[in-house]
Amino acid sequence: INTIFFYLPVLANNSPVDYVNTLVGTQSKFELSTGNTYPAIAMPWGMNFWTPQTGDMGDGWTYTYNADKIKGFKQTHQPSPWMNDYGQFALMPVTGGVVFEQNQRASWFSHKAEIAKPYYYKVYLADHDVTTEMTVTERASLFRFTFPEEQNSYVIVDAFDKGSYIKIIPEENKIIGYSTRNSGGVPENFKNYFIIVFDKPFQFTAVALDNAIKTNQTEIEGNHAGGIIGFSTHKGEQIHARVASSFILSLIHISEPTRQEAI
């Protein structure tokens, strides 16, 4: 996994893709557009895009250049802010207290500590002293979180509102779930099923429902479900998360090629 991240910038040095700045066009808002884009990390014709999220849950302007806080790193399928998104969910690393609500977990960031390429994204979350990196395949993604020395390091999984589900499986270092959030144009049984596998055993687990944290449960379903897993970390410790998703199959029957992309 470390080799993948190490070679990403090397491979792109002599490639036209390395000249692409995905932050161009992100200084937009409802009242005024300068592009209405977001910094997508994606493969050509990829099933899923990923993006840092500065806007509130459900805000079509998911990332705006003038914002100074990141609230999560979101899987997105959004074609434009006017059409909004569907099937979205997000990950967010935090340190210190156990939180879930999007504004409580948000962290200040600077564009000086941000790298945004079509194939790779990196940012330093100052409030949590965590560096987040993302890269993708056609159907899956890989996260690397670099934590400080901290007894209370966490990763939040937010399946968003309007109907979602989370199950934490500690013995497999795994979280599964689904998101049904959408803005129309989907069938009644629409779900985006996801599976997230970590490379470090969980020392803490909790779920959340409508921002209320429940530490005695590992499974939750309702309007707005989420999960929280925690670790004790040493300075510079890197934790990886592999993510795959499917619109068609339940997590139990997720296709082997999709599993392999995540693994």
Predicted regions and their residues:
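Bacterial Sec-dependent N-terminal signal peptides
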Residues: 1-14
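Accessory carbohydrate-recognition regions in carbohydrate-active enzymes
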Residues: 13-255, 259
